[in-house]
Amino acid sequence: MRIENSFIPVHGVGETTERRLWENGVTHWDEFDGSVVGSTLAARIETFIEEGRAHLERGDVSPFAEALPAASRWRCYENVSDETCFLDIETTGLDASCEDVTTVSLYRGGETKTFVKDRDLTAARLERELDESALLVTFNGQRFDVPFLETCFDVSVDVPHVDLMYPCKKLGLDGGLKAIEREIGIDRDMPELSGRDAVRLWHEYESGDEGSLETLVEYNRADTRNMEPLMEHVADRLHEDVFEAATAGD
C-alpha cells in the first residue's frame, strides 16, 4: 500500500470515510471522485492530493507521517523503502540523563553501519546519516531510542518515523522485538541476547575484552537488519487487512 492509496491524512477524513471512498472505487488519488463525499471535504481532499504529489516528487513523506496515527505510519514505507533507515541503539541503562549510548547501528539499502562510543559515535555522524534517510524505522524507538539520542547528543531527530511496536500491536503481535521475530519466523544468526547482556558486554569491553565489543556490535546490527523483514511483514499484513479487505468487491 502506498501513500497515494491513503486519504486519512486529510483533516476530517477518518477510517470510515476512507473505507467508503475505497468501496466506491476511489482506491487511488488518480481516481478521486468528489461526489462520494460532501463538497467541502472534496475540496480539502483535492488540495491534499495536489500538495501531496509535490511532496512525493521530492521523496518527502514527512507531512503524511505527521498526519497519520502511529499505528498507520507503515503506509509511508513502500514509497521510500530504498531510503529507509532501520535504527537500533544499545545503552548502559534506561535513564538518558545519566547513562550512555554505547553503539548505534543503522541499516539502509542493504548496508549496515555501526558507530561506537569513544570511537566514531558523534552527533555529526548521526545527523549526517539521518539526513540521508527519507524514513526512520525503529522498534520502541518513539519512547526509547529517539529520546535517548536527542538527550545524549543534543540532536533533533526530525526524520519521519515508523515505530514498529504500534502496527505490530494492531496485528496482535505483542512483546519485544525478538519475541515477535520468533512468532513470525525471522531467524537470527547468533544466540539471543538481552538488553541486560548488552550492558554487561559493554562493561567487559571497557575492562579490556575486545571480543565482548564484537559480540555487542553484532547483536546491535542483527536488531537493525531484522527490522527490515519485520517491516515488510507488517506492511503486507496490514495491506491485506486494511486495504484489500475494503476493496475486495471492486
Task: List PLM regions with ranges.
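Conserved DEDDh/DEDDy metal-dependent 3′-5′ exonuclease domain
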Residues: 105-106, 110-185
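Short phosphate-engaging motifs
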Residues: 28, 122, 144-145, 223-226
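Acidic, Mg2+-coordinating catalytic module of metal-dependent nucleases/exonucleases
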Residues: 183-250
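Conserved RNase H-like, two-metal-ion catalytic cores of nucleic-acid enzymes
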Residues: 65-135
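N-terminal accessory regions of nucleic-acid-interacting proteins
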Residues: 1-81
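Acidic active-site catalytic centers that drive phospho-/nucleotidyl reactions
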Residues: 88-90, 145, 163, 223
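Short, function-defining helix-loop hinge/capping sites that tune catalysis or transport
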Residues: 22, 96-98, 148, 171, ...
